């Protein structure tokens, strides 16, 4: 996916968000976000992007579709702060590079271990770091959308009890789907889509 675009708010690359703040600010921000974060409508199951399918061949354990925990997490102040921290950390540590320049192929989804990647690689890295921090895999969805210019763009969606939030390499802000301005979406099909909707306390899981 050729999604290496111009920097937005000082962040270079393609998908997922964040900023540090004192506890009081984080609490107020989380409260406001909870009021305006709708769920993305679940449409018919679509075929997974070829890049995701190939990624799951190479990293099969990370694509296990067996639901082990409910998909939604409780958006506590701690969880909100962690989302923002990880989003910013990945956005600032990875530099944008197209798959053709990086791998010599038109499309490849992989981790930006060498410090370079395009939008889906940012999203994959954020997903990986969140899972390592204890977030349930079933709450972290890879999505392909149309950006503001009508181009294909990959991003990470985090499902919470307060709505769905987008971690995007084009901004350091964690936004609700409604606030991104993106159009359409393809949810990765390699995920059990109808897991129980009882919330999981992300803060407890993150505490490990």
Residue ranges of predicted features:
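Bacterial N-terminal signal peptides
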Residues: 13-26
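Helix-centric, low-specificity signal for extended rod-like, repetitive segments
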Residues: 1-2, 25, 119
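N-terminal secretory signal peptides that target proteins for export/translocation
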Residues: 1-9
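A structural boundary/capping signal
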Residues: 30-208
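Short hydrophobic "helix-edge" motifs at membrane interfaces and signal-peptide entry regions
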Residues: 10, 19, 49-51
């Amino acid at each position: 996916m050729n999604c290496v675009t111009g920097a937005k708010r000082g962040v270079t690359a393609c998908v997922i968000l964040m900023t540090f703040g004192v506890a009081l600010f984080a609490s107020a921000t989380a409260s406001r976000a909870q009021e305006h974060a709708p769920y993305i409508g679940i449409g018919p199951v679509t075929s997974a992007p070829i890049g995701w399918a190939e990624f799951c061949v190479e990293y099969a354990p990370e694509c296990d579709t067996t639901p082990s925990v409910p998909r939604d997490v409780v958006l506590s102040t701690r969880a909100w702060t962690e989302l923002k921290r990880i989003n910013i950390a990945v956005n600032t540590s990875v530099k944008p590079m197209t798959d053709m320049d990086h791998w010599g192929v038109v499309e490849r989804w992989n981790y930006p271990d060498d410090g370079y990647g395009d939008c889906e690689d940012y999203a994959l890295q954020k997903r990986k770091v969140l899972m390592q921090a204890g977030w349930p895999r079933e709450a972290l969805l890879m999505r392909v959308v149309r950006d503001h210019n009508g181009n294909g763009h990959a991003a990470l969606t985090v499902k919470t009890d307060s709505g769905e939030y987008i971690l995007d390499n084009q901004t350091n802000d964690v936004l609700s789907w409604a606030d991104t301005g993106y159009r359409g979406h393809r949810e990765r099909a390699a995920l059990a889509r109808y897991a129980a909707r009882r919330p999981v306390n992300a803060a407890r899981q993150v505490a490990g």
